[in-house]
Protein backbone atom coordinates (compact mmCIF):
# COMPACT_ATOMS: atom_id res chain seq x y z
CA UNK A 1 0.00 0.00 0.00
CA UNK A 2 2.88 2.34 0.70
CA UNK A 3 4.02 1.86 -2.87
CA UNK A 4 0.57 2.89 -4.08
CA UNK A 5 0.52 6.14 -2.11
CA UNK A 6 4.06 6.95 -3.20
CA UNK A 7 2.71 7.25 -6.75
CA UNK A 8 0.25 9.99 -5.76
CA UNK A 9 2.82 12.74 -6.40
CA UNK A 10 4.32 11.18 -9.52
CA UNK A 11 3.66 13.68 -12.37
CA UNK A 12 4.13 10.98 -15.02
CA UNK A 13 1.34 8.69 -13.80
CA UNK A 14 -1.54 10.66 -15.31
CA UNK A 15 0.15 10.66 -18.72
CA UNK A 16 0.78 6.92 -18.45
CA UNK A 17 -2.89 6.17 -17.76
CA UNK A 18 -4.19 8.47 -20.49
CA UNK A 19 -1.79 6.91 -23.00
CA UNK A 20 -3.11 3.47 -22.08
CA UNK A 21 -6.85 4.23 -22.25
CA UNK A 22 -6.99 6.82 -25.06
CA UNK A 23 -6.36 6.14 -28.73
CA UNK A 24 -4.94 9.64 -29.20
CA UNK A 25 -4.15 12.42 -26.75
CA UNK A 26 -5.80 15.45 -28.31
CA UNK A 27 -4.99 18.03 -25.64
CA UNK A 28 -4.37 21.06 -27.86
CA UNK A 29 -6.23 24.24 -27.01
CA UNK A 30 -8.18 24.86 -30.22
CA UNK A 31 -10.49 27.83 -30.70
CA UNK A 32 -13.60 25.65 -30.51
CA UNK A 33 -12.38 24.08 -27.28
CA UNK A 34 -11.72 27.50 -25.76
CA UNK A 35 -15.21 28.67 -26.74
CA UNK A 36 -16.77 25.53 -25.25
CA UNK A 37 -14.80 25.97 -22.02
CA UNK A 38 -15.84 29.62 -21.77
CA UNK A 39 -19.49 28.67 -22.28
CA UNK A 40 -19.33 26.00 -19.57
CA UNK A 41 -17.71 28.42 -17.13
CA UNK A 42 -20.43 31.03 -17.80
CA UNK A 43 -23.06 28.33 -17.31
CA UNK A 44 -21.48 27.28 -14.02
CA UNK A 45 -21.34 30.89 -12.81
CA UNK A 46 -25.07 31.13 -13.47
CA UNK A 47 -25.54 27.92 -11.47
CA UNK A 48 -23.64 29.39 -8.53
CA UNK A 49 -25.60 32.68 -8.58
CA UNK A 50 -29.01 30.99 -8.89
CA UNK A 51 -28.46 28.55 -6.07
CA UNK A 52 -26.85 31.22 -3.88
CA UNK A 53 -30.01 33.32 -4.24
CA UNK A 54 -32.11 30.32 -3.18
CA UNK A 55 -29.89 29.72 -0.14
CA UNK A 56 -30.07 33.40 0.86
CA UNK A 57 -33.86 33.35 0.51
CA UNK A 58 -34.19 30.24 2.69
CA UNK A 59 -31.75 31.52 5.32
CA UNK A 60 -33.04 35.07 5.71
CA UNK A 61 -36.78 34.37 6.02
CA UNK A 62 -38.08 32.37 8.99
CA UNK A 63 -41.10 31.45 6.89
CA UNK A 64 -38.87 28.97 5.08
CA UNK A 65 -37.28 27.39 8.18
CA UNK A 66 -39.27 24.17 7.90
CA UNK A 67 -38.03 20.65 7.29
CA UNK A 68 -38.88 20.80 3.61
CA UNK A 69 -36.97 24.03 3.03
CA UNK A 70 -33.93 22.78 4.94
CA UNK A 71 -33.74 19.83 2.56
CA UNK A 72 -34.37 22.15 -0.35
CA UNK A 73 -31.54 24.37 0.84
CA UNK A 74 -29.30 21.32 1.10
CA UNK A 75 -30.05 20.44 -2.53
CA UNK A 76 -29.33 24.05 -3.54
CA UNK A 77 -26.02 23.90 -1.63
CA UNK A 78 -25.00 20.73 -3.46
CA UNK A 79 -25.92 22.33 -6.80
CA UNK A 80 -23.93 25.45 -5.91
CA UNK A 81 -20.86 23.39 -5.03
CA UNK A 82 -21.39 21.36 -8.20
CA UNK A 83 -21.12 24.59 -10.17
CA UNK A 84 -17.85 25.43 -8.41
CA UNK A 85 -16.54 21.88 -9.00
CA UNK A 86 -17.43 22.03 -12.69
CA UNK A 87 -15.57 25.33 -13.07
CA UNK A 88 -12.47 23.84 -11.43
CA UNK A 89 -12.80 20.72 -13.57
CA UNK A 90 -13.01 22.81 -16.75
CA UNK A 91 -10.02 24.98 -15.85
CA UNK A 92 -7.94 21.90 -15.00
CA UNK A 93 -8.89 19.97 -18.15
CA UNK A 94 -7.36 19.87 -21.62
CA UNK A 95 -3.60 20.29 -21.78
CA UNK A 96 -3.53 21.03 -18.02
CA UNK A 97 -4.65 17.46 -17.27
CA UNK A 98 -1.32 15.89 -18.18
CA UNK A 99 0.55 18.21 -15.81
CA UNK A 100 -1.49 17.09 -12.78
CA UNK A 101 -0.25 14.66 -10.18
CA UNK A 102 -2.58 11.75 -9.30
CA UNK A 103 -3.63 13.37 -6.02
CA UNK A 104 -4.59 16.56 -7.88
CA UNK A 105 -6.49 14.52 -10.45
CA UNK A 106 -8.35 12.65 -7.69
CA UNK A 107 -9.29 15.96 -6.07
CA UNK A 108 -10.56 17.32 -9.40
CA UNK A 109 -12.79 14.36 -10.16
CA UNK A 110 -13.68 13.53 -6.56
CA UNK A 111 -15.25 16.94 -5.97
CA UNK A 112 -17.72 16.30 -8.79
CA UNK A 113 -18.59 12.86 -7.40
CA UNK A 114 -19.11 14.31 -3.91
CA UNK A 115 -21.56 16.97 -5.10
CA UNK A 116 -23.40 14.42 -7.24
CA UNK A 117 -23.71 12.11 -4.22
CA UNK A 118 -25.02 14.98 -2.11
CA UNK A 119 -27.67 15.76 -4.73
CA UNK A 120 -28.85 12.14 -4.85
CA UNK A 121 -29.06 11.90 -1.06
CA UNK A 122 -30.91 15.25 -0.93
CA UNK A 123 -33.50 13.88 -3.35
CA UNK A 124 -33.85 10.82 -1.14
CA UNK A 125 -34.33 12.99 1.96
CA UNK A 126 -37.01 15.04 0.17
CA UNK A 127 -38.84 11.86 -0.87
CA UNK A 128 -38.77 10.53 2.69
CA UNK A 129 -40.01 13.88 4.01
CA UNK A 130 -42.91 13.81 1.54
CA UNK A 131 -43.88 10.35 2.74
CA UNK A 132 -43.60 11.40 6.38
CA UNK A 133 -45.66 14.54 5.78
CA UNK A 134 -48.34 12.54 4.00
CA UNK A 135 -48.53 10.04 6.85
CA UNK A 136 -48.65 12.89 9.40
CA UNK A 137 -45.90 11.17 11.40
CA UNK A 138 -44.03 13.14 14.03
CA UNK A 139 -40.57 12.13 12.89
CA UNK A 140 -38.35 14.84 14.29
CA UNK A 141 -39.84 15.57 17.70
CA UNK A 142 -39.12 18.70 19.71
CA UNK A 143 -35.50 18.85 18.63
CA UNK A 144 -36.42 18.57 14.95
CA UNK A 145 -33.90 21.17 13.77
CA UNK A 146 -31.03 19.30 15.40
CA UNK A 147 -32.14 15.98 13.93
CA UNK A 148 -32.64 17.40 10.47
CA UNK A 149 -29.21 18.99 10.55
CA UNK A 150 -27.75 15.67 11.69
CA UNK A 151 -29.47 13.95 8.76
CA UNK A 152 -28.09 16.53 6.34
CA UNK A 153 -24.64 16.23 7.91
CA UNK A 154 -24.77 12.45 7.61
CA UNK A 155 -25.66 12.71 3.92
CA UNK A 156 -22.64 14.93 3.30
CA UNK A 157 -20.39 12.61 5.31
CA UNK A 158 -21.50 9.64 3.21
CA UNK A 159 -20.99 11.71 0.06
CA UNK A 160 -17.45 12.65 1.14
CA UNK A 161 -16.61 9.02 1.83
CA UNK A 162 -18.12 7.82 -1.44
CA UNK A 163 -16.36 10.48 -3.49
CA UNK A 164 -13.11 10.06 -1.56
CA UNK A 165 -12.73 6.29 -1.95
CA UNK A 166 -10.37 6.57 -4.94
CA UNK A 167 -7.93 8.86 -3.15
CA UNK A 168 -8.10 6.50 -0.15
CA UNK A 169 -6.92 3.62 -2.31
CA UNK A 170 -9.76 2.31 -4.49
CA UNK A 171 -8.15 3.27 -7.79
CA UNK A 172 -6.24 1.61 -10.61
CA UNK A 173 -2.75 3.01 -10.11
CA UNK A 174 -0.29 0.29 -11.12
CA UNK A 175 -3.23 -1.75 -12.52
CA UNK A 176 -3.78 -0.33 -15.98
CA UNK A 177 -5.99 -3.19 -17.16
CA UNK A 178 -8.54 -2.32 -14.44
CA UNK A 179 -8.79 1.37 -15.42
CA UNK A 180 -11.85 3.24 -16.65
CA UNK A 181 -11.66 4.81 -20.11
CA UNK A 182 -13.70 7.89 -19.19
CA UNK A 183 -11.86 8.40 -15.89
CA UNK A 184 -8.45 6.81 -16.49
CA UNK A 185 -7.26 6.76 -12.86
CA UNK A 186 -10.50 5.31 -11.50
CA UNK A 187 -11.02 1.56 -11.25
CA UNK A 188 -13.90 0.24 -13.35
CA UNK A 189 -15.30 -1.57 -10.31
CA UNK A 190 -15.47 1.72 -8.39
CA UNK A 191 -17.30 3.47 -11.23
CA UNK A 192 -19.74 0.55 -11.51
CA UNK A 193 -20.31 0.52 -7.74
CA UNK A 194 -21.06 4.25 -7.54
CA UNK A 195 -23.40 4.28 -10.54
CA UNK A 196 -25.20 1.21 -9.18
CA UNK A 197 -25.71 2.86 -5.79
CA UNK A 198 -27.07 6.03 -7.40
CA UNK A 199 -29.35 4.03 -9.71
CA UNK A 200 -30.77 1.95 -6.85
CA UNK A 201 -31.44 5.10 -4.79
CA UNK A 202 -33.16 6.81 -7.72
CA UNK A 203 -35.31 3.73 -8.39
CA UNK A 204 -36.26 3.68 -4.71
CA UNK A 205 -37.23 7.36 -4.90
CA UNK A 206 -39.35 6.74 -8.00
CA UNK A 207 -41.07 3.81 -6.28
CA UNK A 208 -41.72 5.97 -3.22
CA UNK A 209 -43.29 8.74 -5.29
CA UNK A 210 -45.45 6.23 -7.18
CA UNK A 211 -46.68 4.94 -3.84
CA UNK A 212 -47.36 8.48 -2.62
CA UNK A 213 -49.25 9.25 -5.83
CA UNK A 214 -51.59 6.28 -5.45
CA UNK A 215 -52.14 7.06 -1.77
CA UNK A 216 -53.04 10.65 -2.62
CA UNK A 217 -55.34 9.67 -5.49
CA UNK A 218 -57.20 7.15 -3.32
CA UNK A 219 -57.56 9.46 -0.30
CA UNK A 220 -60.14 12.06 0.62
CA UNK A 221 -60.27 15.54 2.15
CA UNK A 222 -57.04 17.51 2.47
CA UNK A 223 -54.80 14.51 1.72
CA UNK A 224 -55.99 14.45 -1.90
CA UNK A 225 -56.55 18.18 -2.19
CA UNK A 226 -54.99 20.46 -4.80
CA UNK A 227 -52.28 21.52 -2.34
CA UNK A 228 -50.98 17.98 -1.94
CA UNK A 229 -51.22 17.27 -5.66
CA UNK A 230 -49.30 20.46 -6.43
CA UNK A 231 -46.52 19.46 -4.04
CA UNK A 232 -46.40 15.99 -5.56
CA UNK A 233 -46.18 17.50 -9.04
CA UNK A 234 -43.27 19.71 -8.00
CA UNK A 235 -41.17 16.93 -6.51
CA UNK A 236 -41.92 14.80 -9.55
CA UNK A 237 -40.62 17.56 -11.81
CA UNK A 238 -37.43 17.91 -9.75
CA UNK A 239 -36.81 14.16 -9.81
CA UNK A 240 -37.70 13.88 -13.50
CA UNK A 241 -35.31 16.66 -14.49
CA UNK A 242 -32.51 15.03 -12.49
CA UNK A 243 -33.05 11.67 -14.19
CA UNK A 244 -33.28 13.21 -17.66
CA UNK A 245 -30.08 15.21 -17.18
CA UNK A 246 -28.02 12.46 -15.57
CA UNK A 247 -29.30 9.33 -17.34
CA UNK A 248 -26.99 9.80 -20.38
CA UNK A 249 -23.95 10.25 -18.08
CA UNK A 250 -24.91 7.21 -15.99
CA UNK A 251 -25.37 5.18 -19.17
CA UNK A 252 -21.94 6.12 -20.50
CA UNK A 253 -20.34 5.20 -17.16
CA UNK A 254 -22.12 1.84 -17.11
CA UNK A 255 -20.88 1.19 -20.65
CA UNK A 256 -17.39 2.21 -19.56
CA UNK A 257 -17.39 -0.33 -16.73
CA UNK A 258 -18.10 -3.21 -19.12
CA UNK A 259 -16.29 -2.15 -22.30
CA UNK A 260 -12.70 -3.32 -22.99
CA UNK A 261 -10.08 -0.62 -23.35
CA UNK A 262 -10.27 1.31 -26.66
CA UNK A 263 -13.20 -0.84 -27.83
CA UNK A 264 -15.98 1.78 -27.47
CA UNK A 265 -15.22 5.06 -29.32
CA UNK A 266 -18.32 6.71 -27.85
CA UNK A 267 -16.55 6.82 -24.48
CA UNK A 268 -14.18 9.44 -25.88
CA UNK A 269 -17.19 11.79 -26.18
CA UNK A 270 -18.19 11.41 -22.53
CA UNK A 271 -17.51 15.10 -21.81
CA UNK A 272 -20.60 16.02 -23.85
CA UNK A 273 -22.76 13.81 -21.61
CA UNK A 274 -21.35 15.39 -18.45
CA UNK A 275 -21.82 18.89 -19.87
CA UNK A 276 -25.49 18.06 -20.44
CA UNK A 277 -25.75 16.80 -16.86
CA UNK A 278 -24.68 20.21 -15.51
CA UNK A 279 -28.00 21.60 -16.75
CA UNK A 280 -29.66 19.89 -13.80
CA UNK A 281 -28.01 22.25 -11.32
CA UNK A 282 -29.09 25.19 -13.49
CA UNK A 283 -32.73 24.10 -13.79
CA UNK A 284 -33.40 23.20 -10.15
CA UNK A 285 -33.60 26.81 -8.86
CA UNK A 286 -35.87 27.68 -11.80
CA UNK A 287 -38.22 24.88 -10.77
CA UNK A 288 -38.29 26.00 -7.11
CA UNK A 289 -39.09 29.61 -7.91
CA UNK A 290 -41.53 28.74 -10.69
CA UNK A 291 -43.60 26.55 -8.37
CA UNK A 292 -43.63 28.86 -5.31
CA UNK A 293 -44.70 32.48 -5.55
CA UNK A 294 -43.41 33.26 -2.05
CA UNK A 295 -39.97 31.82 -2.74
CA UNK A 296 -39.87 33.58 -6.09
CA UNK A 297 -40.57 36.90 -4.38
CA UNK A 298 -37.85 36.27 -1.79
CA UNK A 299 -35.28 35.09 -4.34
CA UNK A 300 -35.80 38.17 -6.50
CA UNK A 301 -35.60 40.58 -3.56
CA UNK A 302 -31.76 40.97 -3.62
CA UNK A 303 -31.96 41.77 -7.32
CA UNK A 304 -34.65 44.36 -6.65
CA UNK A 305 -32.51 45.92 -3.92
CA UNK A 306 -29.56 46.03 -6.33
CA UNK A 307 -31.71 47.77 -8.93
CA UNK A 308 -32.86 50.32 -6.37
CA UNK A 309 -29.23 50.91 -5.46
CA UNK A 310 -28.60 51.68 -9.12
CA UNK A 311 -31.43 54.16 -9.12
CA UNK A 312 -33.88 52.01 -11.04
CA UNK A 313 -37.11 51.86 -9.08
CA UNK A 314 -39.76 49.37 -10.15
CA UNK A 315 -43.45 50.12 -10.18
CA UNK A 316 -43.95 48.36 -6.88
CA UNK A 317 -40.71 49.42 -5.31
CA UNK A 318 -40.57 49.99 -1.61
CA UNK A 319 -38.31 49.89 1.37
CA UNK A 320 -35.67 47.18 0.75
CA UNK A 321 -35.86 46.16 4.36
CA UNK A 322 -39.59 45.58 4.57
CA UNK A 323 -40.89 42.25 5.82
CA UNK A 324 -42.29 39.68 3.41
CA UNK A 325 -46.03 40.30 3.25
CA UNK A 326 -48.59 37.52 3.04
CA UNK A 327 -49.46 36.75 -0.54
CA UNK A 328 -52.89 36.21 -1.96
CA UNK A 329 -53.45 32.73 -3.27
CA UNK A 330 -52.86 32.56 -7.00
CA UNK A 331 -52.23 28.86 -7.55
CA UNK A 332 -52.93 25.50 -6.04
CA UNK A 333 -49.54 25.63 -4.39
CA UNK A 334 -50.58 28.58 -2.19
CA UNK A 335 -54.25 27.81 -1.52
CA UNK A 336 -53.39 25.62 1.45
CA UNK A 337 -51.44 28.26 3.37
CA UNK A 338 -53.66 28.11 6.45
CA UNK A 339 -54.36 24.39 6.41
CA UNK A 340 -53.27 22.36 9.44
CA UNK A 341 -49.65 21.39 9.16
CA UNK A 342 -47.69 18.37 10.21
CA UNK A 343 -44.63 18.72 12.45
CA UNK A 344 -42.34 18.04 9.53
CA UNK A 345 -43.12 20.97 7.28
CA UNK A 346 -45.36 23.95 6.60
CA UNK A 347 -47.88 22.96 3.93
CA UNK A 348 -48.48 26.45 2.63
CA UNK A 349 -44.82 27.20 2.16
CA UNK A 350 -43.51 23.94 0.76
CA UNK A 351 -42.50 23.97 -2.88
CA UNK A 352 -41.41 20.38 -3.34
UniProtKB/Swiss-Prot annotation:
Pfam families: 7tm_1 (PF00001). Glycans are attached at residue 19. InterPro entries: EDG5_rcpt, GPCR_Rhodpsn, GPCR_Rhodpsn_7TM, S1P_rcpt. The keyword Lipoprotein applies. A lipid is attached at residue 305 (S-palmitoyl cysteine). It is found in: Cell membrane. Keywords: Cell membrane, G-protein coupled receptor, Glycoprotein, Lipoprotein, Membrane, Palmitate, Receptor, Transducer, Transmembrane, Transmembrane helix. One of its GO terms (molecular function) is integrin binding. It comes from the Eukaryota. GO terms for biological process: actin cytoskeleton organization; excitatory postsynaptic potential; filopodium assembly; G protein-coupled receptor signaling pathway; negative regulation of excitatory postsynaptic potential; negative regulation of smooth muscle cell migration; negative regulation of vascular associated smooth muscle cell proliferation; positive regulation of establishment of endothelial barrier. Most abundant in heart and lung; low, but clearly observed in kidney, liver and thymus; much lower but detectable in brain, testis, stomach and intestine. Not significantly detected in any of the sections of embryonic day (E) 14-18, except in embryonic brain. Residues 333-352 are annotated as: Disordered. Residues 60-66, 129-147, 211-233, 293-352 are cytoplasmic. Its main location: membrane. Residues 1-34, 96-109, 174-189, 256-271 are extracellular. The chain crosses the membrane at residues 35-59, 67-95, 110-128, 148-173, 190-210, 234-255, 272-292. GO terms for cellular component: glutamatergic synapse; plasma membrane; postsynapse; presynapse. It is a multi-pass membrane protein. Receptor for the lysosphingolipid sphingosine 1-phosphate (S1P). S1P is a bioactive lysophospholipid that elicits diverse physiological effects on most types of cells and tissues. Receptor for the chemokine-like protein FAM19A5. Mediates the inhibitory effect of FAM19A5 on vascular smooth muscle cell proliferation and migration. In lymphoid follicles, couples the binding of S1P to the activation of GNA13 and downstream inhibition of AKT activation leading to suppression of germinal center (GC) B cell growth and migration outside the GC niche. Belongs to the G-protein coupled receptor 1 family. This is Sphingosine 1-phosphate receptor 2. It comes from Mus musculus.
